[in-house]
Design a protein with these regions (language model features):
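Conserved internal helical-beta-strand scaffold that buttresses enzyme catalytic cores
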Residues: 1-71, 77-84, 89-102, 108-118, ...
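Thiamine diphosphate
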Residues: 99-217, 221-225, 433-434, 445-456, ...
Length: 653
């Protein structure tokens, strides 16, 4: 293939590139058509299409489902076998995800690469998944051109009237192999003998038109010849092109944003909010309507939050809610979804309150002011793959929206691994497609076992390159506040992966003052205050919850010759800041990298990659195939060994 005209690092094969255009209908109306870029991981793009459409419905069309429609083209083998199809179809009537119905076009060529359809599904039809939502299915002969056109029009009318999914099963065949180099006669010799003898749909339709007296054979032959000449002319033109120009998908939406350099991602961004404004918004979201009755514990939660403001000691949830509230007041849109997200897995957020003895919900963040931006929060169905794909698509179309997907526990992110690998980490490098999706992945070693401890930080760090995303482990409410606000207040749009806390949500040390939210910005590094740097003999770098365990041991034992540095941003790693801190401590005997995770996990190998000359000594749990142990006493023993190794001259076994 030819080189790209733009500075895309790698690009992609032509089959995967997206496209946009505006066409004029026979009635003179202009319609915008968008073809999503998509990988060879079949059916993944369907979730993104749903998210894109819902985003436009929310932000551009004021909830009108008739202004935009999703169309998803499937293969018969894929729609019958890929689990994400079921996840996405289950969304179709859910309040947080419905798009007014999808047109599903199934190109049923009765073979999946080399697999016969009898080996590809147990159901009679490839479209039997439509029974889940009782959607109509039209089975159409692929040789009957007019029947296909009629069915597509009928399906669209049905969709517009009933706002439900419609399936069109086009029974047809694949004339050649799976790709240019494939020989189908190896595996389907009988089928391809039949296909060889079968007239193509164009000739069948030409014969029909001739029989009707609509067009003569000579006229259709002439039309075919004219079209062949047109194609040949375009081919000749393409030969003169030296470099391919990849038309950037959604270019218009991202004109104000740039592909970031490393400098862009470590420059301070002003994210503070005036104190009076913070207090006003806090008052609004901590006030329940007097005409509604709430569960007593809800009243207590709200009262506790009011006291936080008065005591000037805000916890994680309060800072998080204020981040959303301030963005909403600035006119941005905020959308947050995931399993149990309204309340929060750990009952910390309470973004909605249920009115007692009813199903009515009250959303404080929807009631800040009449001029605020839209706030959406939804509990998703029990899906990671489909929902993450949806939220990625949602965030694509509106760079002024803070779109967040939260995992119930960070451990479950890998159910959606395809979305991370094929889209979140690589879409810009392949397709020039920007995105600012935020992910909340609860992470922390607290003795809850291998399924509820690790969001596998190492996996995300392994995907980092070319400033493609941010990987962050904030440890203070203020830093979380500034981090969330930064995502919309700088002129770049890249994904943000946040490893959020669990036990720290209510930790007495994990609080921030109103001034810390009002002033300052996100801190990539947080240093402990040291009055006499010359006395320090151990310099400990760490991140996440382990900092508070280290701090507690240090305070209990009155240790003065050790200082602890929190690395809040793991990518882009603040290399210059780390080196500058090391240079300050002239008498240090040991530079330690301490982490809760096993040595083959966490950030250790990532740090070695970017700081190979720094003589770090690793203190962590031993290398392990499983991310965490399942016994509390074992967990506590390992933690004690880490702390002992940091503060005493002991070797971690």
């Amino acid at each position: 293939g030819k080189e790209y005209e733009q500075d895309l690092s790698l690009g992609d094969v032509k089959y995967h590139l997206g496209y946009e255009s505006e066409v004029e209908t026979d009635h003179g109306k202009k319609v915008r058509l968008s073809l999503m870029p998509n990988p060879s991981h079949l059916e993944t793009v369907g979730a993104l299409v749903q998210g894109m459409v819902r985003s436009r419905i929310d932000s551009q069309y004021n909830g009108d489902y008739n202004r935009v429609a999703p169309i998803v083209i499937h293969g018969d083998a894929a729609i019958a076998a890929q689990g994400i199809v079921y996840e996405v179809i289950q969304m179709s009537q859910l309040a947080g995800y419905k798009t007014g119905g999808t047109i599903h076009l199934v190109i049923n060529n009765q073979v999946g690469f080399t697999t016969n359809y009898l080996d590809a599904r147990s159901s009679t039809y490839s479209t039997d998944v439509a029974k889940v939502t009782r959607s109509p299915v039209f089975h159409v002969n692929g040789d009957d051109v007019e029947a296909i056109i009629f069915t597509v029009k009928l399906a669209m009318e049905f969709r517009q009237k009933f706002h439900a999914d419609v399936f069109i099963d086009i029974l047809c065949y694949r004339k050649y192999g799976h790709n240019e180099g494939d020989e189908p006669r190896f595996t389907q010799p009988l089928l391809y003998k039949a296909i060889e003898k079968h007239p193509n749909p164009r000739d069948i339709y030409a014969d029909k038109l001739a029989a009707q007296g609509t067009l003569t054979k000579a006229e259709t032959t002439n039309l075919n010849h004219e079209f062949d000449l047109f194609l040949e002319g375009k081919y000749k033109e393409s030969e003169k092109i030296d470099k391919v120009k990849v038309r950037r998908f959604l270019k218009g939406e991202y004109l104000d944003y740039k592909n970031p350099s490393k400098i862009d991602l470590i420059q301070p961004v002003k994210t503070g909010v005036k104190k009076v404004e913070l207090l006003r918004i806090a008052e609004r979201i901590n006030t329940l309507p007097a005409d509604k009755k709430f569960f007593k514990k809800i009243d207590r939660i709200v009262e506790d939050r009011r006291m936080m403001i008065l005591d000037n000691r805000m916890d994680w949830a309060m800072a998080e809610l204020l981040a959303y509230g301030t963005l909403l007041e600035e006119g941005f849109q905020v959308r947050l979804s995931g399993q149990d997200t309204e309340r929060g897995t750990f009952a910390h957020r309470h973004a909605s309150f249920v009115v007692e003895d009813t199903d009515e919900k009250y959303f404080p963040l929807k009631n800040i002011s009449e001029t605020q931006g839209q706030f959406h929060v939804f509990n998703s169905h029990l899906s990671e793959y489909g929902v993450l794909g949806f939220e990625y698509g949602y965030s694509l179309t509106n760079p002024r929206s803070l779109t967040i997907w939260e995992a119930q526990f960070g451990d479950f992110f890998n159910v959606a691994q395809v979305i991370f690998d094929q889209y979140i980490s690589s879409a810009y490098e392949k397709w020039g497609m920007m995105n600012s999706l935020v992910l909340y992945l609860p992470h922390g070693y607290e003795g809850q076992g291998p399924e509820h401890s690790s969001a596998r930080i190492e996996r995300f760090l392994n995907l980092t390159a070319d400033n493609n995303m941010q990987v962050v482990v904030p440890t203070t409410p203020a830093n979380m506040f500034h981090l969330v606000r930064r995502q919309l207040h700088w002129n770049v749009r890249i994904p943000l992966i946040i490893f959020t806390p669990k036990s720290l949500l209510r930790h007495p040390m994990v609080t921030s003052s109103v001034d810390e939210l009002s002033n300052g910005h996100f801190q990539e590094i947080i240093e402990d205050v040291v009055s006499k740097p010359e006395k320090i003999r151990k310099l400990v770098f760490t991140y996440g919850k382990l900092y508070y365990d280290l701090h507690k041991r240090q305070a209990e034992e009155g240790i003065q010759d050790v200082t602890i540095v929190r690395v809040e941003q793991l990518f882009p790693l603040p290399i210059d800041q780390i080196k500058s801190i090391i240079a300050k401590y002239q008498h240090v005997e040991k530079i330690i990298w301490a982490q809760d995770e096993p040595s083959n996990m966490g950030a250790w190998q990532h740090v070695q990659r970017f700081l190979p000359t720094v003589p770090f000594e690793l203190i962590s749990r031993p290398a392990s195939a499983s991310p965490a142990g399942g016994l509390m006493y074992q967990h506590n023993l390992r933690l004690k060994m880490i702390l002992d190794s940091v503060f005493e001259e002991k070797v971690l076994a």
